[in-house]
Regions:
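Catalytic/RNA-binding core of pseudouridine synthases
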Residues: 1-256
Length: 256
């Protein structure tokens, strides 16, 4: 996310650039960028809800809970529920070994415990959260694990989009401060499996939608007029009703 800010500074030729909501290195999607006076409303933007489409891969666990990390555990085979119903021996083999048993019904039951619920999460060690003035990932890179307090988050909706092989795709609508990597890890654990987040795309951040976003590659090819037109007005970010009033009341309203 910091790299994106630095690139935008060069494109728009200004130092006053900020962003809302850090994206993981392997994640794609919406990253709201604020330029000039708009940096004053970053805190407001960060309070908005988010929507992600993510993929969980069962049978692999990494130290970062995503594709960036070192593999800690790996299973050699994934057996689906359909395979098990075809032959009892597959069920027996799955039960007695560490191979992954993908029971779709079990996942749907577990999802109910997260859907439209407030949850508590322990932030992953590989995250930008600070502890004693240092980022957690800085401790993690030194092989130091520090105690992390649970953080509250809210899952507005959690939908399974599809199953394929040992992978499950989800759509998650959630509050700020939600760690999707940790969510996937918890869901897998609740089904007696382990997994990692194999892909993640933030499709929406408050009023900002991916279909209206500009890629860095596209911005780099914009002329000055196109760059200006790519920016939203600050007042358009706020989801408040517009009220027009007489000029004589301006001072009173400004002073509260």
């Amino acid at each position: 996310s910091r790299d994106v800010v630095n690139i935008v500074r060069k494109i728009y030729k200004t130092k006053k650039v900020g962003h809302a909501g850090t994206l993981d290195p392997n994640a794609t999607g919406v990253l709201p960028i604020a330029i000039g006076n708009a940096t004053k409303i970053v805190e407001y933007i960060q309070s908005m809800g988010k929507c992600y489409v993510g993929e969980m891969t069962l049978g692999i666990e990494t130290d970062t809970l995503d594709t960036e990390g070192t593999i800690l555990k790996k299973e050699t085979k994934v057996i689906s529920k359909e395979d098990i119903t075809k032959a009892l021996k597959y069920f027996e083999k799955t039960y007695n070994s560490k191979e992954v048993y993908l029971d779709k019904n079990q996942f749907f039951e577990v999802i109910k415990e997260y859907d439209n619920k407030k949850i508590s999460q322990i932030p992953p060690m590989y995250s930008a959260l600070k502890k004693n003035g240092k980022r957690l990932y800085e401790y993690a890179r030194l092989g130091i694990e520090v105690e992390r307090e649970k953080r509250e988050a809210e899952i507005y909706s959690l939908i399974i989009l599809n199953f394929y092989d040992n992978k499950i795709r989800f759509e998650v609508n959630c509050s700020k401060g939600t760690y999707i990597r940790s969510l996937f890890n918890d869901i897998a654990s609740d089904t007696d499996n382990f997994a990692y987040m194999s892909s993640l795309c933030r499709s929406k951040y408050g009023i900002f939608k991916i279909e209206n976003a500009f890629s860095l590659e596209r911005l780099k090819n914009f002329n000055e007029n196109q760059l200006y037109n790519s920016l939203m007005k600050i007042e358009d970010v706020f989801e408040y009703e517009r009220i027009d009033f007489d000029k004589k009341y301006f001072k009173h309203i400004s002073n509260g």
